[in-house]
Regions:
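N-terminal, post-signal peptide beta-strand-biased segments of exported outer-membrane/organellar beta-barrel
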Residues: 19-128, 132, 196
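Residues on the lipid-exposed face of transmembrane beta-strands in outer-membrane beta-barrel proteins
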Residues: 42-44, 104-113, 122, 170-178, ...
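Outer-membrane beta-barrel channels and translocator barrels
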Residues: 47, 115-118, 179-181, 267, ...
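Solvent-exposed loop/turn segments connecting transmembrane beta-strands
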Residues: 31-36, 350-354, 365-369, 373-388, ...
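Residues that define the transmembrane beta-barrel architecture of outer-membrane proteins
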Residues: 36-38, 102-107, 164-170, 254-258, ...
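Transmembrane beta-strands of outer-membrane beta-barrel proteins
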Residues: 52-55, 120-122, 184-188, 272-275, ...
């Protein structure tokens, strides 16, 4: 049963832990005087001569829930208090495929400096992402039982997907102004994996006989994982050898990634930008295992690869109620039908959660900018689109005020705000992609907060001045 508990732990991590995603939409992405905007587009032009931060530079924490909502499962009185639990209403509100995602990015160290050849950056970040997907049939079965699947809905067809990943990222970036209109950017990433888990398949079919009400259960499960602890296989079971984490093992889970970006200023009012982030892979070599699930022939309930339950006799029911040892023995017998076999594997490769960003903007004047952006982002369960409209107010080359509105599948109430201020070289910022999430989190799709402190140095450098410096450097060579 230990390997089953390990699988359950991995699933629980996907539901409860924090995690980081490939770049999510944030008001910080639209700031003009905050070098953190480089995270969204490596071609972003920063007027700062240099910046650095240690541990306090950036935290991005959030939850995305496209599925279960508190207010969908209750009826409320005139005072707004829940009075009746309405499971049918809650199930009807669900999509065919639902998601629960959590993420966290922690910037450990960042720095950047302008030279005569361009702008160079370095960053060290810890990133983590967990994503759980589930279909409506899972909640419907839990809420209404198997009776809800008689007739044309037979069988209950349950699909669950889990994706969990944690790694460190070391990134070297370069941004260059080709002309006063063209900016390009490149960021190379070296990755060190901590842990990974993903379901290649997790399906349960529960068929109810319309006449006898006998239950027929068929399962398919395949989970690949890389664990942070050393383990050995003994008698077909996985045993953790040492629960102490060894940092040297990080070098065995290695990867490479790249971010590409560009910006073109059409005229004094209009501009466009695009970026492709997190294009790459991680090779998981350390403590890798593959779990394969199937129905075992454990006795009379087994039938051609399925578990068939026709009920208990009156004597068995009475024995369960009267004899604790009999009940324990029966449960052990039933669990013998369900097997998750761990298989030691040499390793496997996973791609990063790549995302594409395309943006257009209009500068009313030097202070006010209006933007429209499309982003296709990946949470480990496929590419999802997000469309964002944004306003940026930038003042005195020190302050940014940003308001965003983002639409994505199943979520249309995302109003974000962001503030950034530079006080004599001390830059502080705070932002959220959905201010409503703080007032009613149980009923919101997104809950997010992003904040940090950096130190900037040197005089501000305009694009025109940068071009002159780069041209002079080229002539000198």
């Amino acid at each position: 049963m230990k390997h089953i508990r390990i699988i359950a732990t991995l699933v629980l991590m996907a539901v409860l832990s924090s995690a980081s995603v490939a770049q999510m939409v944030s008001p910080v992405d639209f700031m003009r005087y905050n070098p953190r905007a480089l995270n969204a587009n490596p071609a972003f032009y920063t007027t700062d001569y240099g910046f650095f931060d240690l541990m306090l530079g950036g935290y991005n924490i959030g939850v995305q829930n496209i599925g279960l909502k508190y207010d969908k499962f209750f009826r409320f009185n005139a005072a707004g208090q829940p009075t009746v639990l309405d499971l049918d209403k809650g199930v009807a509100s669900l999509r065919d495929k639902n998601y629960l995602n959590t993420y966290i990015n922690v910037d450990i160290f960042n720095c950047g400096r302008r030279t005569k050849h361009g702008y160079f950056t370095y960053s060290h970040r810890f990133r983590e992402l967990e994503s759980l997907s589930y279909n409506k049939d899972l909640v419907k079965l839990l809420a209404n039982g198997n009776a809800a699947f008689l007739g044309e809905n037979n069988p209950a067809d349950i699909n669950i997907g889990v994706s969990a990943r944690a790694f460190q990222e070391f990134a070297f970036g370069y941004q260059m102004s080709l002309t006063e209109q063209w900016n390009i950017g490149l960021r190379l990433k070296f990755l060190m994996g901590f842990m990974d888990a993903k379901t290649n398949a997790m399906n349960v079919k529960l068929y109810t006989d319309p006449e006898t009400y006998a239950l027929k259960l068929m399962t398919t499960a395949n989970v690949q994982a890389t664990l942070p602890y050393e383990f050995v296989m003994e008698d077909g079971k996985m045993k953790i050898v040492d629960r102490r984490f060894n940092p040297a093992t990080l070098f065995k889970n290695y990867g490479l990634g790249v971010d590409l970006g560009g910006e073109y200023i059409i005229n004094e009012h209009w501009g466009v930008a695009a970026a492709l982030n997190d294009l790459g892979f991680i090779k998981w070599n350390n403590h890798s295992v593959n779990f394969v699930g199937e129905i075992n022939d454990g006795g009379s309930f087994y039938d051609n690869g399925a578990f068939v339950f026709t009920g208990l006799t009156n004597e068995q029911v009475q024995a369960i109620m009267d004899d604790e040892h009999f009940a324990d023995h029966l449960m052990d017998s039933l669990t013998g039908y369900f097997n998750l076999t761990p298989q030691n594997v040499a390793g496997y490769t996973t791609g990063l959660y790549t995302n594409l960003m395309v943006r257009g903007y209009y500068d009313l004047d030097a202070t006010n900018r209006f933007s429209a952006q499309f982003m296709g982002y990946n949470l480990g369960m496929g590419m999802k689109p997000a469309v964002t409209l944004a306003y940026t107010g930038s003042f005195k080359e020190q302050y940014d005020v940003v308001a965003t509105y983002t639409m994505m599948p199943g979520s249309f109430d995302n109003l974000g705000i962001g503030l950034s201020a530079n006080f004599g070289g001390l830059l502080m910022y705070v932002a959220t992609n959905n201010i409503f999430g703080f007032f009613n989190p149980a009923n919101r799709t997104n809950l997010n907060v992003q904040f940090g402190i950096s130190f900037t140095s040197g005089e501000k450098v305009s694009r025109a001045e940068t071009i002159i410096i780069q041209d002079q450097a080229a002539e000198g060579e």
